[in-house]
């Protein structure tokens, strides 16, 4: 007859074996090649002409991204006409794009054959930096959309958001971005469940990619709805102004020009990032689709987006363009270093012109 100690020791032994088996299912010590080979994603062994060209182009674009967005941040800092909450948020968007440039710069030196040298931790860091930069950009664009919506519909000449609140918003944006980028590193990955591994991102779990992709796409939709609401409101006010106001047409043209600038910035972001996010969903929902053939193209498209905003500002905003030239030419003028007469009126903010037209319209109707 078995003794009591045998009955007790047998379950304990089984539990320890189960625990050991469970631990053996995690592959933290495996090479990156192990995950890539299992997912079927190609992992280069040597540099070819195309890889060198892509790396050279990528590094060049990264340097331009960082310098151009640094120029935007400096321009907003030195020109007091830009010292409004909306421009602080735009500066933070430039900071997010600057961070994206750093993330892509790190990626360029750890891609191709160099990917094989990465550990699980450094691979997750590489991807986490890109995820953080995207989340920061999305959250910042959403904050700008909400600020514009509130300001326009409350008919305020200047937003009542204090500088302290702007700082709080910026801190929240970066906190959310860092958390979203760090989630896979702290456990939401497929290292312990290889069946859930993605083909495009071999160490990421499908469930996390679904969550991350849908989160960003829903945010895109919310921003589009907010700006569409603003656009309809502005168009209605413009029509009323044209019927009842004898004010100059220049104000209305400026108003629509500023609205177009905002829409172009948002539109460029959505156009550059949506294809890549949809590709992630196809990777999960359509395993037979050859989505890996298009991965690098969409990644490059997303990278170019971080360089677009400074170009858009330079082309669409004369004040910003003039400030860029003064900085690059090392000029110091009264216009840049201090507010001039009527600088508040000339600050290129959408709601300034809207409200001028609205008040003029109300007076004419009365």
From Swiss-Prot:
Which cysteine residues pair off into disulfide bonds? Answer: 26-192, 190-197, 286-289
| Residues carrying covalently attached carbohydrate according to the record | 29, 37
In the record, biological process GO terms are: adenylate cyclase-activating G protein-coupled receptor signaling pathway; adenylate cyclase-inhibiting G protein-coupled receptor signaling pathway; negative regulation of neuron projection development; neurogenesis; positive regulation of MAPK cascade; positive regulation of Rho protein signal transduction; positive regulation of stress fiber assembly; regulation of cell shape
The text of the family note is: Belongs to the G-protein coupled receptor 1 family.
- Purpose: Receptor for lysophosphatidic acid (LPA). Plays a role in the reorganization of the actin cytoskeleton, cell migration, differentiation and proliferation, and thereby contributes to the responses to tissue damage and infectious agents. Activates downstream signaling cascades via the G(i)/G(o), G(12)/G(13), and G(q) families of heteromeric G proteins. Signaling inhibits adenylyl cyclase activity and decreases cellular cAMP levels. Signaling triggers an increase of cytoplasmic Ca(2+) levels.
Organism placement in taxonomy: Eukaryota, Metazoa, Chordata, Craniata, Vertebrata
Topological domain ranges for the Extracellular compartment: 1-52, 110-123, 187-206, 283-296
Q: Where in the cell is it found?
A: Cell surface; Cell membrane; Endosome
Gene Ontology terms, cellular component aspect? cell surface; cytoplasm; endosome; plasma membrane
Q: Which GO molecular function entries does the Swiss-Prot or TrEMBL record give?
A: lysophosphatidic acid receptor activity
Q: Which InterPro entries match?
A: GPCR_Rhodpsn, GPCR_Rhodpsn_7TM, LPA_rcpt, LPA_rcpt_EDG2
Entry keywords, A to Z? Cell membrane, Disulfide bond, Endosome, G-protein coupled receptor, Glycoprotein, Membrane, Receptor, Transducer, Transmembrane, Transmembrane helix
How is this protein named in the record? Answer: Lysophosphatidic acid receptor 1-A
Q: In which tissues is it expressed?
A: Expressed at high levels in oocytes and at lower levels in brain and spinal cord. Below detection level in lung, heart, kidney, liver, muscle, stomach, and intestine.
Tell me which SMART domains the record gives: 7TM_GPCR_Srsx
Mode of membrane association: Multi-pass membrane protein
Q: Where does a 1-acyl-sn-glycero-3-phosphate bind?
A: 41, 126-131, 212
Stretches assigned to coiled coil: none
Instruction: Spell out the Pfam families in the cross-references.
Output: 7tm_1 (PF00001)
